[in-house]
Amino acid sequence: MKIDDFSHWVRERQQDVERALERWVSDDSPAGLGSVMRYAVLDGGKRLRPLLVMAAAEAVSGDAAAALRAAVSVELIHAYSLVHDDMPCMDNDILRRGKPTVHVKYGEAQAMLAGDAMQALAFEVLTPDDGMSPPLMSALVRLLARASGHDGMAGGQAIDLASVGRQLDEQALRDMHRRKTGVLLQASVMMGAACGPADAAALAALSDYGAAVGLAFQVVDDVLDVTQDSEVLGKTAGKDVDQNKPTFVSLLGLDAAQKYAHDLRDQAHAALARSGLGQAAYLACLADKIVERDN
């Protein structure tokens, strides 16, 4: 696929997501809460998870309206997790997406409430009164809940907090980041796939693809934390080193970590090749984008 075609597709889908978020994240919530939510989720971020949802849905000729709802719900969960992760009781960060973190701008209480509200809104978006079949609705809710709950993102963050100052082996580090970061990216792929017809072999291959790009994203994050500055990243660089957190760079070394990211990208491409899907080019390009990004 030509890079211009992919870039055009990315811009169009990002605009679709941005318009949907503008519509669903209301500014009229009580006591200014809507403004805090909009600050947290609008006008920033790569929208990678929504792009994975929509690329997977298109790969299986899925329902575009359902895929857009799934894409927005995943981004709301991601945004809520960033708001909470940045708070002083967690990672205590002051910069996110090139601007002050939510608790720095609005205070800890409003940040906590905004995160809670976005989490709830994510599931409201997935449960419309009409226009989506109950089985699809149930499947999407289950995928997102499992990815974001105790056995997924929240559990991974708990491991992350408990691992400060500790040396994890590669298996333990993979497990932590699979939960904290990887499963939501994998769920994004599977939520998109759920929006259309796909046989068991294709679903298994897409799950493998999602697992590979999910872990690759975190490996690249670890690399960028030591190779880029805060202005490029849009968040505080060097935080993992400063907080003595285990990373793939600290465990494997920079060169080996970079090679590992490329190996995972190759695994993602191999999974797509065995999926039997003829419209998976955008997923392949997203795997490249994840590994080759600079922020």
Please identify what each model-predicted range represents.
Residues M1-V25:
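N-terminal amphipathic/basic leader segments beginning at the initiator methionine
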Residues E22, S29-H269, L277-V291:
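Mg2+-dependent prenyl diphosphate-binding active-site environment of isoprenoid biosynthetic enzymes
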Residues R293-N295:
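Charged C-terminal helix
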